[in-house]
Amino acid sequence: MEFAEYKDYSPGDEIRHIDWKVAGKTDKYHVKQFEQSTNLKCTILLDSSGSMGYQSPFKKEESKIDYARNLVAGLSYLFLKQFDAVGLTLFNNQVVHHIPPRSKASHLKNILHGLSNFSAKGATAIEDVLASLTEHLPGRSMVILISDFLIGNQDIHKNLKLLRSRGLEVILFQILHPDELNLPFEGDTVFESLEDDTMVGLDPIDIREEYQKAIQEKIDHLKKISNGLGVDYMLLDTSTPLQQALSYYLLKRKSLTKI
């Protein structure tokens, strides 16, 4: 058991957990709370930039960020159920919100609260955020990075290599909408950036084949980088059942247990 925090004493609390030194200084009784010793500590990094807010303009369905929220909630539940510690960092071009890893079951409320109190906005700067966070992440732990990885990524190889050099297990979940994979629109269409004021008008049929080739090359590039560094990678579109992603994590967790 590891000490986690203090709480005010209330009837029913075990007297043996009262910190008498603190009581002597404050004239109040405080009880030590403990966490189960954790096998694994994980920080989930969630891209909350504007592009993650995309959802189909024609269908009522969840956006990429809503899909990601559900994924983070499911992963956090699994971590805590196994007495592993999990934390959450929201970012766009900077860290927006940070919840340190904890292994208490009640910590799920903190994660869910963090997930419900933001909207997808701002530009993306994954490389800058990773560079600033890496030295603060606990060594010999796990990092799960969730993003659409649509913008930037020029230095993602260097960032991931640095994470791996510190002994961190890394999992990338790339979340895309089927529209971003297939460009199914027809007729004259105006495309508006969710991260700046850029607007482009064109007929998708004129660029569909070239676009699909470019997006696939981008996916393949990220996958190749991941494989070369021993980073686990999974592509998810928003129609993919979350169970597939959660099962992928459980298999990874099982393999770590055997090491």
Predicted regions and their residues:
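Short, electropositive alpha-helical surface patch
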Residues: H97-H113, G228-V231, L251
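Conserved phosphate-coordination/catalytic loops
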Residues: D66, A120-E127, L150, K213-Q216
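Short, contiguous clusters of charged residues that form electrostatic/catalytic patches at enzyme active sites
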Residues: N70, G74, T124-A131, Q154, ...
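An amphipathic, basic-hydrophobic helix/alpha-beta surface used to engage anionic
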Residues: M1-R102, M142-I146, G152-N153, K158, ...
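Short amphipathic alpha-helical interaction patches enriched in hydrophobic/aromatic residues
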Residues: M52, S56, L115-S119, D206, ...
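Von Willebrand factor type A / integrin I
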Residues: E2-E5, E135-S141, N153-I259
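Von Willebrand factor
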Residues: H107-I144, N153-D155, L176-H177
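Short beta->alpha junction loops/turns
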Residues: K104, D148-F149, T238-S239
